[in-house]
Amino acid sequence: MLNIEERYDPKRNTVTEVTVYYSDIKKVKVAHAKAEFTDVVKRDMFDVEISGGAVVTMEVKTLDLQVNCTGRSLLTLSGDTKYLTMRVSTSNMNGAKLYTVASIVDVSHNAEVRINVSERLEAITSTDAKLLYKGSPAILRDHTSLFGGYIRNID
């Protein structure tokens, strides 16, 4: 595991850039930082955890992708995955260019998620969260809680 941390200094006005080279990556956790992945992440199974206002952009090619995005973060995903399991809270996840076959999505606390799904979508929204999806899944299981939110097809 590689952990990169930097101490906060309010007097400093420069940005630190770090380049990480990898050959095999299973999981990414980003907090309080901006991260851009220049290469496509290719794995059978891959996990992404974003928090603390992080801004992350990546392209994936996976069979199974698990995403957890919290804390006013912004995650932009593109590419394709067969199975997507996602939990997003108080954040935005733009997966307009992420193509999935089957997705399980839980969106809460004013979060907004955009995805493409072709066959199966299981979705839950609560506390004013929004799920916008493209595609015509044959199986659609959706639930909006008492505290609002919505799930909409935007094709």
Annotate each PLM feature.
Residues 75-155:
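Short, surface-exposed interaction patches in beta-rich subdomains
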Residues 1-51, 64-68, 78, 82-85, ...:
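Acidic (Asp/Glu) and glycine-rich low-complexity loops/linkers
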